[in-house]
């Protein structure tokens, strides 16, 4: 049996405007820094060929980010829930979450997994295909921008001493403690 010790709603705590602003600033800052680092180490001339492939990957960045989260939660696939965040039919903006208690450490690893996994892929691709390094650095910065909400949740979870389990809901996270049910017979 689990008891909720704390509820976290990032939207109510920070607000959509602040989260969007933090995401935009993180994206711009990450691109400026990563591009300068890449430009310092690589001496290959940059190419603007295959620009439409970049546009496709820009549009797919959010779904790819979500898929990386869901792949790590594959042991909990029976508890996957999908909630459409946009009322417009043509906007594919979904919130996917696991509706079962997950250990806090496992959940924290899942929060940072897309940051390290996708960033590592983009850095490796910029090393192996240096002529498109600026494309990969832009995709890396978009990934960091998409991860801003994950970083905010991670910060709150790491500094929370309340419980050892986390359960996701449409409204945010619930931090839970596992307790023995006093009404069960031994």
What do these predicted regions represent?
Residues 1-38, 89-176:
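Metalloprotease/metallohydrolase-associated module, dominated by Zn2+-dependent proteases
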Residues 35, 179-186:
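Hydrophobic alpha-helical transmembrane segments
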Residues 57-61, 144-147:
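Alpha-helical transmembrane segments
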Residues 62-67, 86-95:
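Hydrophobic, membrane-facing alpha-helical anchors
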Residues 69-82, 159-160:
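Catalytic Zn2+-binding segment of zinc metalloproteases
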């Amino acid at each position: 049996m689990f008891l909720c010790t704390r509820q976290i709603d990032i939207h109510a705590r920070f607000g959509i405007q602040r989260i969007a602003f933090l995401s935009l600033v993180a994206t711009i800052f990450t691109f400026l820094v990563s591009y300068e680092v890449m430009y310092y180490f690589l001496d290959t001339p940059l190419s603007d060929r295959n620009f439409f492939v970049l546009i496709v990957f820009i549009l797919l960045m959010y779904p790819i980010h979500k898929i990386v989260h869901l792949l790590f939660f594959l042991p909990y696939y029976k508890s996957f829930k999908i909630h459409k965040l946009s009322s417009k039919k043509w906007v594919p903006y979904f919130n996917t979450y696991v509706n079962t208690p997950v250990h806090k450490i496992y959940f924290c690893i899942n929060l940072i997994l897309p940051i390290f996994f996708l960033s590592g892929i983009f850095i490796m691709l910029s090393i192996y295909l240096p002529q498109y390094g600026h494309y990969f650095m832009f995709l890396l910065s978009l990934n960091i921008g998409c991860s801003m909400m994950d970083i905010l949740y991670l910060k709150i979870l790491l500094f929370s001493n309340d419980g050892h389990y986390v359960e996701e809901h449409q409204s945010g996270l619930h931090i839970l403690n596992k307790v023995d049910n006093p009404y069960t017979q031994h």
